[in-house]
Amino acid sequence: MVPDAPVPLERLLVILFTVACLTVVSEVLGTVGLFRVVPLTIALACAGLGLAKIAPAGSAPGQHSIRTEAPPGIGAGSITAQTTKWVAVVAVFVVLGEWLTATVLALHNGVTALDSIWYHLPTAARFAQSGSTWRLHVIDTTSLAVFYPAGSEVIHAVGMEFLGTDALSRGLNVGWLIVGLLAAWCIGSRWGVGPLTLLAAAVVFATPQLVRVDAGQALNDMQVVALVLSAIAIIVTCAPAQGSWLPRGSVAAAGVAAGLAAGTKWPALAPVAALTIGIPFLVRRGDRVRSLVLWFAALLVCGGYWYARNLVHVGSPIPPLRIGIGRIHFTQIHPGLPTFSIVHSLASSGVWRRQFLPGLRLVFGPAWWSVVALSAAGIVAVVAARERRIWIMAFVGAATVIAYLLTEQAFDITQWSATARFAATGIALGLITFAIAVSRLSAKTQLLTLAFFGTTILATQFDAQLWKAWWRVGGLKVFFVALVGTAFMAIAGAVVSASRTTRFGPVRLAPVIVALVVVSVAAGAALDWYQPRFSGSRLPMLAAARKLQKRHVVHSRIALTGTLYAAGSQYYFYDKRLTNYVQFIGAPGAHHTVRLFQNCEAFIGSIAAGRYDYVVAEAAAGPSNPIRWLRSDPAAREIFVDPSGRIGLFEIVGPQRRTGCAG
């Protein structure tokens, strides 16, 4: 599809098409209820053989038709270029150290990020348990999470299906981190500044919020950033020369990456829409129709599944959004929680003082002003550029940030910093654009930019959120991280070695052999240390979960009911091998939504209909008090109720009756 691509881009394309193949095959099988190990294995093997057969043969090293454009006065062997490479290498290992530390901590303590245990992993577990990706999985009473795209959850579910645990989920985002760094390198390599653009991306990837909520967790922000950067990398790299038009095959390849991003989460629609607007300006006039057909086909195949599922089930691709023209409108389902828009508060000095400035510090670390200022400068600096490829990067970055500011977010303005990661793609593109634009001026400006980026990453390491709590686990963690770091160095050496020659003698294979040995030893240490279930978290809901763990409850049906507090803790009640069936229940509403139970009869009837063995109940404000209702039911035996009376755990020991309920 993209013949004669440089080696780094070839590696990136292999990763993208592997993920696309895995995603599409899983979605197709899941639609007919065949998301199982044997059908997956057969289908993936056939798809892999098909891709290998149609893939174009690569060029010999050094014979690629895609040319790079070195910055003026900066040769590959210059002091500036060498300094940039070494600083980039150090930055990569710093960022990997942050992410691997958090990942290893997650192996020890379990996944604890709210969104992970609220809907990411429960959705993935349901895919693996039911074998279906087509059914809507009710998560809570908000009418939001049930309709989210689940591209990342499918990948988690594949790991659960093959391994029987969520161990793969805890390391998946480190893989996306590496993809993001590789894509950033590919973007800059077109202008001969690959290490500098990699460093620019590392500035964002090292920020406290991304590390805290994505590293070792099941959130998908890093996946979206990596996929959008990959689409940009294909677009800016695959034109044969400056001013040349983008080939149709490259448009389709970029569409694959963009489609995967759109199928991962709704905020990715903004950069994907911006790319769609830019595609006609990057291809020949006579090729625009065919290129757009390929682009939209790739988007629909790789990212349209979840929107089609919503459309069939409830009558809208994005149910919370008002979509329509004139009298024709799709179904709109209003979220069951308050929302806010950041743009409405931008003119308030009080909000800036109390929320925005402290939030920026929390999200981006001590050097937040540098991250924001350099990113904004990169988007503005595009005015001086004369290339469409640089314009498209700045346009996508600006569109992502503007869409984030305009979009309605959940809860209220005091929670804005929790969603700032949605703008990470735009911030990263701003920094990358800044690196490219400034480095083309002179060697001095490149060194100055290098100093800014390096100092920003260094300053970020002094943020207490990154290291303070993570080094309390013990020396084994340090040992494990050191082993994994060594493995990464060996793998990096193998990749560099392979990129220089196609001959693999004993010397060339040595780094690969070392990497395999180190990973094997590290895996042994990890298995001895691995704790599958949330040993480090102290959330109140865990008291009920630990009661079930002590009873060794497996292969049981567990119902949860209550507010978002109960819904946000449901993954705690899965066992180590994910055999428990955990379901949030509520009074049925329209369009696959639920609400709090308002009477005892409906609540008890729902438990009986679901044949649940255990019920975890939260007593909400108002008439909804399932704990009192269960206490009045002779078929429910109380196992645990917390001192506040808010959370209760009950075992269903006999047939339930709907009459005579207390309330």
What are these regions (language model features)?
Residues 180, 184-188, 280, 354-401, ...:
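Hydrophobic, aromatic-rich transmembrane alpha-helices
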Residues 535-542, 546-586, 612-620:
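Short periplasmic/luminal acceptor-recognition loop of GT-C membrane glycosyltransferases, typified by
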Residues 271-300:
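Perimembrane helix-loop-helix junctions
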Residues 572-624, 642-648:
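Luminal/periplasmic acceptor-recognition loop/helix of membrane-associated glycosyltransferases
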Residues 238, 281, 353-366, 443-551, ...:
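Transmembrane helical bundles and short interhelical boundary loops of multi-pass, membrane-embedded
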Residues 66-84, 189-197, 242-250, 283-294, ...:
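Membrane-interface helix-loop-helix junctions at transmembrane boundaries of multi-pass membrane enzymes
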Residues 4-14, 167, 184-207, 226, ...:
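Transmembrane-helix signature of polytopic, membrane-embedded enzymes
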Residues 1-69, 73, 90, 439, ...:
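Membrane-embedded, hydrophobic transmembrane alpha-helices
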